[in-house]
Design a protein with these regions (language model features):
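Acyl/amide activation-and-transfer machinery of modular secondary-metabolite enzymes
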Residues: 165-174
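Universal eukaryotic N-terminal targeting presequences
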Residues: 1-2
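Nucleotide and nucleotide-moiety/phosphate-recognizing core
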Residues: 5-131, 138, 142-146, 150, ...
């Protein structure tokens, strides 16, 4: 169903429509909803609300993967990887990427949390740049066979201590109301600004 739906978006013979695929990665929800590690999913939902102003396009469940997808337009596909752990993102997402028609005409942008950026900051990095130790991005690279995807890094800040357990507890903690408000305003506006050249 996923491939067929995407296929219907492709125009007729002689012209290949370019597709932008925004993929948000995170841990299973609702268990980890609104945690810092799921900032990529939070931002994907905010982007969908803004880009689909009429609210007429909702997520559909993938039949063969723990993920959801949404066609905001014939040129823009959103994939929400929310059914398996973020460190296994490649296992979930890449089979869906491989089912897209005209793969060479697809621009992939992965939306993810970023410890090295403070909350409210967003960075768009080109394919081939550092993965900065993000295990979800590493998994995508491993399963895709390359790092040929853009990364939209959503800042979540970093705890003062660098102890691995402290960092783990931090990324699995939930955003409070004020932090969610920052994501929905400052972070969202910066994300839209960064994505202008690709959407």
């Amino acid at each position: 169903m996923f491939a067929a739906r995407v296929g219907r978006s492709a125009p007729s013979i002689g012209f290949v429509r370019r597709l932008t695929c925004l993929t948000g990665i995170g841990n299973p929800e609702p268990q980890y909803a609104n945690t810092r590690h799921n900032a990529g999913l939070v931002m994907l939902d905010l982007l969908r609300q803004r880009l689909d102003s009429g609210g007429s396009h909702s997520y559909k469940v993938c039949m063969n993967a723990p993920a959801k997808y949404c066609h905001v337009s014939p040129d823009l596909l959103l994939i929400r990887s929310d059914g398996d752990y973020i460190n296994l993102s490649g296992k979930t997402v890449v089979p869906l990427w491989k089912r897209l028609p005209h793969r060479d005409a697809v621009t992939h942008i992965v939306v993810h949390d970023e410890l090295s950026l403070p909350l409210g900051k967003v960075q768009l990095r080109k394919p081939g740049t550092s993965l900065r130790g993000h295990n979800g991005l590493r998994s995508l690279r491993s399963h895709w066979g390359s790092d040929g995807f853009h990364r939209l890094a959503i800042g979540i800040g970093r705890p003062h201590e660098r102890d691995p357990q402290v960092v783990s507890d931090y990324v699995l903690s939930r955003f409070d109301g004020q932090e969610m408000s920052i994501l929905a305003t400052q972070s969202l506006e910066k994300a839209l600004e960064k994505l202008q050249s690709l959407l």
